[in-house]
Amino acid sequence: MVHQTDFISSTAILKTQKASTSLVHATMFERAMPSLTNAGKASSTKTYTTPTITPPSIKGNPHIWSSDKPSGTLFIAVGSVVGFIFLIIALAYIVSAYISRRQTEKLRFETIDQEFQSHVGGKSYSKLGNSDDPEKSGFLSKAVHTPQSRSVARLLDRPDFQQPSPALSNQDSSTSLAQEFYSSIRDQTAAQNRKSLFISPTVEIVNQQRKSAVLQNMNNSVSSLVSDSGAELNKPEKAAPSTRKAMYKARNKSSMGSAVGIAKSRSTSPVKSGLRDKPLDRAKTPSVYLDKMFEDES
């Protein structure tokens, strides 16, 4: 009997457990997914129609402007112009730097050649003409045509030097002589521009000889200029105009007539003539008085 009661109680417990689990599942199913009858009653469906916009065709439409250029053409054009400007600035900077470098090298070669020429003589051109540097050899070939008297007596020749022409005036000649002949010891400009400490003792002697020769040539040119100017003065090219000559003659006649009238008036005036004819009473000197006394006694 005991076993039967236990079996009945266990089966009752199992049934109650199954019933409780079925209730839980049912409630969960109802909460998670509503039934079709409840969904149809609670929700209502609404439909909306969205229109599709289609733009008109560009082909053959005069009221719509279209460009056949690709997108970004304006930015490409502006960028190319700006880049071209920057390229021009860079090229100008490079060209100016190259030109200044060439001028600096040319000045350096000129200074070296002049110093060497002043120490050695005229044979340096033939020795240096076969140099491997084309720029220096070309410069030296140009320098061969310059007179030797220019750089023999100069330790530091200036690049802006020019030979004085014989047709210069006295002032220009003096200034050119002041630039041409200078002493490496006394001249302040040469002392400031010196590039070596070498002082040639023969500079002064050569300068004096050259100065005397140039002064002699200048004297000859000045004398020739004076003789030519005298010939031009004797034969003037332009004569005075006839109207000026007539005015000058009339002026001379009027001045001469006035002078004659004044002289006549002075000679005819009785008061002035009487005053002039009457001698002035002056005191006699002692010597004249003694001479007259001795004459009366004799």
Curated annotation (Swiss-Prot):
**Localization per Swiss-Prot or TrEMBL:** Vacuole membrane
Q: Which domain of life is it from?
A: Eukaryota
Annotated TM spans: 75-95
Task: Identify the keywords attached in UniProt to this record, alphabetized.
Answer: Membrane, Transmembrane, Transmembrane helix, Vacuole
Asked if Transmembrane is a keyword of the record, the answer is: yes
Write down the InterPro entries for this protein, in alphabetical order: PRM
Q: How does it sit in the membrane?
A: Single-pass membrane protein
Q: Which GO terms describe its cellular component?
A: cellular bud neck; fungal-type vacuole; vacuolar membrane
* The keyword Transmembrane is annotated on this UniProt entry: yes
For region Disordered, the annotated ranges are 123-146, 226-298
Biased region (Basic and acidic residues) positions are 274-284
| UniProt similarity note | Belongs to the PRM5 family.
Q: What is this protein called?
A: Vacuolar membrane protein KLTH0G09570g
